Amino acid sequence: MYYSNKMSKVITGKQYSWSELAKHNTENDCWVAVDGKVYDITRWVPLHPGGKEVLLLAAGRDVTNLFESYHPMSDKPTSILKNYEIGYISSYEHPKFVQKSDFYKTLKERVRKHFKATDQDPQMAVSIFSRLALVYLLVFVTYYLAHYTSNNFYLNCFLAIVYALCNSLFSMHMMHDSCHAAISHYPGVWKWMGASFDFVTGASFLSWCHQHVIGHHIYTNVRNADPDLGQGEVDFRIVTPFQTRSWYHKYQHIYAPLLYGIYTLKYRTQDWEAFVKDGKNGAIRVSVATNFDKAAYVIGKLSFVFFRFILPLRYHSFTDLICYFLIAEFVFGWYLTINFQVSHVAEDLKFFATPERPDEPSQINEDWAILQLKTTQDYGHGSLLCTFFSGSLNHQVVHHLFPSIAQDFYPQLVPIVKEVCKEHNITYHIKPNFTEAIMSHINYLYKMGNDPDYVKKPLASKDD
């Protein structure tokens, strides 16, 4: 028996700690926690319409907000889940959101009505597959052009940049949609598209899913939970009040954006740490990899080495090839990183900090959906070029609230979100264009590195 903070009343039943829950994280022993209750969904794994991979990603965790945000169009999943209830969760691995407002409920109802009224499927449209076909075509054509069509050094340097940009588009369109299961209703589609990400980039799709879906999307800008924030007390940049400021942070607004170009080093090595070394991606535990995941990981690494080094060596000298490779990797890393950073690390956005991994993590006295509005900004609405070249990350607010809806529909949903925000007196952060979004990011880095009062501002709270 224990007291529920949410209901302020005594609840009886079998209790499980988060560490006990974490042990049940395989296909044959799959538990999850949702809204304080624990469910043994092992029998549901092979029956899940969204495929077993999504459930195995969630296995052994509290997935309350993941469950809510991935089932916005129907209440049926909630009724099905009740059949598998076995007890209650008594402790939490990461901070939990203890507030529930009417904001998200109202918003989901409006979005449902929109899709019903317009007779659209949020995961199926001709535009989805034509867009993905285009980015596949671009990445393979530019790969060929950059590696096998010219011996001119300067032309090849230019082609390396073009290939890197197309590689970024491939990641922000195909990989991003796949990791959120936002493409079609057939799990095999995003499963194999995810595997193609390993093949093309040499980075692990499964590792990215843990960092992005399980970590960043649920604990956006929550330090020691969101893997996208620096976890160490000493880091190359300071973006949260709990980090230690060093002398070099005074210049972080200059050097940090440049260092984003080496993000691909982390991109392609963190999966080794996650799968082999310590089984974690930042603060996020990595689920047990299936045989398919292991095969994709190994084949992806081998194909990356073969197609980026071994095969092109027949056409270029080693030194020239390394030069082209470094140029492409820098542009690829910078373009990906800056697109994600401007959406969350910027002026006027909130950061939530927690103590250093206590046995019972802090509660966040905030509604999860409202936190997404406080930690996220959009930019460049109305620009088709901005939308395409950002993979619709310029509509980041809608994406965080409805990650399982394909990005093609984001512009349609913006007016709905803005309307509900206005009704609930919630600020919708948006910049007019990409340039101003970048400047907001750089200004934030400058203030965190130079203004003592700025870094000492109180942490975000319910009343902010």
UniProtKB/Swiss-Prot annotation:
Location of the motif Histidine box-3: 396-400
Entry's localization field: Membrane
Major location (coarse): membrane
Mode of membrane association: Multi-pass membrane protein
Any GO BP annotation: response to heat
CDD domains per record: Delta6-FADS-like
GO cellular component, one term: plasma membrane
Needed cofactors: Fe cation
Gene disruption: observed consequences: Mutants show a significant decrease in the amount of dienoic acids with a concomitant increase in their monoenoic acid precursors, and have an increased tolerance to heat shock.
Domain Cytochrome b5 heme-binding: 13-90
Keyword Transmembrane: yes
Keywords attached to this entry: Electron transport, Fatty acid biosynthesis, Fatty acid metabolism, Heme, Iron, Lipid biosynthesis, Lipid metabolism, Membrane, Metal-binding, Oxidoreductase, Transmembrane, Transmembrane helix, Transport
Pfam families assigned to the protein according to its UniProt record, in alphabetical order: Cyt-b5 (PF00173), FA_desaturase (PF00487)
Example GO molecular function: oxidoreductase activity
The EC number(s) this enzyme carries: 1.14.19.-
Motif (Histidine box-1): 176-180
SMART domains membership: Cyt-b5 (SM01117)
Enzyme class at the top of the EC tree: oxidoreductase
Domain note: The histidine box domains may contain the active site and/or be involved in metal ion binding.
PANTHER family: DELTA(5) FATTY ACID DESATURASE A, FATTY ACID DESATURASE 2
Chain's role: Specific for desaturation of the 5 position in C16 and C18 fatty acids.
Recorded family membership: Belongs to the fatty acid desaturase type 1 family.
Protein name: Delta(5) fatty acid desaturase A
